[in-house]
């Protein structure tokens, strides 16, 4: 009996020792993590709560504590450590030139019930390539110019009407912009993805309610504006599809940094509420696909891509063409079709709305930048200014305004909407001279040292051969003294006017030119697995920032409503997104 008890204790002890975290040799780590089955989790929970930080803030602090661009953390029980890298050049090299990393498998567990059968969590294989073929047309410049861009512009113009009314009612008081921006962007992405099949709207009910509110003297007197306090506008009820989409977008909130994120996601998505939400999503997707298929020409007829009015119609045409090429029957209602369609919605909705909200904060808190941007816009769209109207999408699409491009690039750099990229080591490999075993997850920070804060000093000999071979880019870094400042000018260079370049090489007259490669930024990732919607994302930000700054002056908000704390979800959005508006008078500016 005693011997059996001793053997049991010994077995439990050996099991405990086996389960303790095991570090990768030489990479810096937190020694206390090796003494707990939960690794770094307790310290991370305590640190984030005590300092009101996100888990990504805490990770960056660990790198500073170790004074190292690469560390390892134990973020899940019974799992190998996650390696963290904060260096733009090495990240760029891995994303663009090296084949020993691929998409991490972790993201599938977080998103597969939110966005079913989507390419974002597939590894780079034949399945991934099949998915991308299906959606490749919706990111072509022709589709953006004819369908996606105009749809986005029209919905941002509806937002202008909402804010015209709110500015009149609030009379200088701040109000929360989050729902307005998210709603307008959601309407926009649904409009270009589904066209006339999308019957809902978040913005039109607001306009109707605000027009009634604005004309009601009783409401106006009961809610007298107070410039130092936020003005609360009445809520507007949305339909089931809009509510379902918003709920699915919010589902990943709280999972970032969780040691059991995949289990939490699975449990959450199988609760009664989310089963109902998923059914609403799936019913809409199938119904829209059915309607789009019904528009196909009869057998023997030719498809007219010029008549396409939505992404769902474009994808149905693409599936038809792929089926003919592959000598198979088209599968219009596959989970892949549905997943890729809904991915257009969530991807475009969450990233664009979050980045726009950050952009409004930066422009509010940097009045000189806002003023210069408005002047640049008015100087470029002279006809729109003379006619006292907003620029049309057609005018926006062809405009090349260096300062606008610089502002957008700086918003993307500073926002950190996607604060990290995750990859999986496919083979035994190295990063900065450290051994990385096959199967190790690596987190590449996009909003930390070398991008948003000063980088670490790294011996050039520790870099990979491909990184060293690209050494002509090693001076592509931001000045440390203002790297954390919102400064669009960092993206502008000087050029000689084209008519002087050949005629007079000694000419001193110069003009500003946007340089998208001026320094480190990772907002859209890099390489094959970079953001698929990058081209559309730029166009959407160009439209939203232009139209909103054209129509409104963003006034300072009280400090207590202007923090830069973030909420972690699919993206990292600002906790405080308050704005105070004054209408721009084009006749006097």
From Swiss-Prot:
- Give the signal peptide range: 1-21
Under what conditions is it induced?
Expression is positively regulated by the trichothecene cluster-specific transcription activator TRI10.
Q: Which residues form a coiled coil?
A: none
Task: Quote the EC number.
Answer: 1.-.-.-
Q: In which pathway does it act?
A: Sesquiterpene biosynthesis; trichothecene biosynthesis
Extract the GO molecular function terms from the UniProt entry.
heme binding; iron ion binding; monooxygenase activity; oxidoreductase activity, acting on paired donors, with incorporation or reduction of molecular oxygen
InterPro entries, from UniProt? Cyt_P450, Cyt_P450_CS, Cyt_P450_E_grp-IV, Cyt_P450_sf, Cytochrome_P450_monoxygenase
Disulfide connectivity for this sequence is none
Q: Which residues are glycosylated?
A: 52, 219, 243, 366
Question: How would you classify this enzyme at the top EC level?
Answer: oxidoreductase
Residue sites binding heme per the record: 531
Q: What superkingdom does the record give?
A: Eukaryota
Cofactors, names only? heme
A single Pfam family it belongs to is: p450
Keywords from UniProt, A to Z, are: Glycoprotein, Heme, Iron, Metal-binding, Monooxygenase, Oxidoreductase, Signal
What does this protein's UniProt record list under function?
Cytochrome P450 monooxygenase; part of the core gene cluster that mediates the biosynthesis of trichothecenes, a very large family of chemically related bicyclic sesquiterpene compounds acting as mycotoxins, including T2-toxin. The biosynthesis of trichothecenes begins with the cyclization of farnesyl diphosphate to trichodiene and is catalyzed by the trichodiene synthase TRI5. Trichodiene undergoes a series of oxygenations catalyzed by the cytochrome P450 monooxygenase TRI4.
Anything further noted? Trichothecenes are sesquiterpenoid toxins that act by inhibiting protein biosynthesis.
Family from the record: Belongs to the cytochrome P450 family.
Protein name listed in UniProt: Cytochrome P450 monooxygenase TRI13
Lineage of the source organism? Eukaryota, Fungi, Dikarya, Ascomycota, Pezizomycotina
């Amino acid at each position: 009996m005693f011997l059996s008890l001793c053997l049991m204790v010994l077995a439990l002890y050996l099991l405990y020792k086996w389960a303790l975290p095991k570090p990768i040799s030489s990479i810096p780590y937190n020694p206390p993590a090796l003494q707990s089955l939960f690794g770094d989790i307790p310290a991370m929970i305590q640190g984030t709560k005590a300092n009101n930080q996100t888990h990504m803030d805490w990770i960056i602090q660990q790198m500073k504590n170790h004074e190292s661009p690469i560390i390892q953390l134990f973020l899940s029980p019974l799992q190998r450590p996650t390696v963290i890298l904060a260096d733009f050049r090495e990240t760029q090299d891995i994303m663009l030139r090296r084949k020993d990393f691929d998409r991490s498998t972790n993201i599938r567990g977080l998103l597969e019930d939110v966005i079913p059968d989507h390419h974002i969590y597939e590894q780079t294989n034949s399945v991934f390539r099949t998915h991308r073929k299906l959606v490749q047309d919706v990111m072509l410049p022709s589709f953006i110019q004819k369908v996606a861009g105009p749809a986005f512009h029209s919905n941002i113009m509806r937002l202008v009407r909402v804010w015209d009314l709110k500015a009149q009612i609030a009379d200088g008081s701040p109000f929360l912009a989050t729902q307005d921006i998210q709603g307008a962007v959601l309407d926009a992405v649904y409009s270009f993805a589904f066209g006339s099949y999308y019957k809902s709207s978040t913005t039109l009910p607001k306009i109707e309610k605000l027009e009634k509110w604005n004309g009601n003297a009783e409401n106006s007197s009961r809610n007298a504006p107070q410039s130092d306090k936020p003005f609360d506008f009445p809520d507007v009820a949305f339909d089931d599809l809009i509510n379902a989409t918003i709920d699915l977008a919010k589902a990943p909130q709280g999972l970032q940094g969780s040691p059991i994120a995949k289990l939490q996601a699975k449990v959450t998505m199988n609760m009664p509420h989310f089963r109902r939400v998923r059914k609403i999503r799936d019913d809409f997707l199938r119904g829209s696909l059915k309607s789009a298929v019904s528009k196909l020409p009869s057998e023997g007829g030719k498809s007219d891509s010029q008549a396409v009015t939505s992404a769902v119609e474009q994808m149905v045409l693409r599936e038809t063409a792929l089926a003919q090429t592959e000598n198979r029957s088209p599968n219009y209602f596959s989970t892949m079709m549905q997943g890729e369609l809904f991915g257009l919605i969530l991807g475009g909705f969450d990233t664009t709305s979050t980045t726009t909200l950050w952009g409004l904060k930066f422009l509010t808190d940097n009045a000189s930048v806002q003023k210069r941007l408005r002047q640049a816009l008015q100087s470029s769209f002279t006809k729109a200014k003379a006619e006292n109207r907003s620029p049309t999408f057609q005018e926006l699409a062809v405009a090349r305004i260096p300062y606008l491009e610089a502002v957008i690039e700086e918003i993307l750099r500073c926002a950190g909407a996607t604060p990290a990229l995750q990859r999986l080591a496919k083979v035994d490999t190295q990063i900065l001279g450290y051994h990385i075993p096959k199967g190790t997850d690596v987190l590449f920070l996009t909003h930390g040292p070398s991008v948003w804060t000063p980088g670490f000093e790294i011996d050039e000999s520790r870099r990979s051969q491909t990184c060293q071979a690209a050494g002509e880019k090693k001076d592509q870094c931001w000045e440390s003294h203002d790297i954390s400042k919102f400064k669009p000018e960092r993206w502008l260079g000087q050029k000689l006017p084209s008519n002087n370049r050949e005629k007079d090489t000694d000419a001193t007259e110069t003009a500003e030119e946007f340089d998208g490669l001026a320094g480190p930024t990772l907002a859209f990732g890099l390489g094959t697995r970079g953001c698929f919607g990058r081209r559309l994302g730029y166009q959407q930000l160009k439209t939203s920032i232009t139209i909103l700054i054209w129509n409104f002056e963003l006034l300072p908000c009280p400090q207590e409503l202007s923090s830069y704390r973030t909420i972690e979800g699919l993206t990292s959005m600002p906790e405080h997104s308050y704005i105070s508006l004054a209408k721009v008078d084009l006749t006097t500016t």
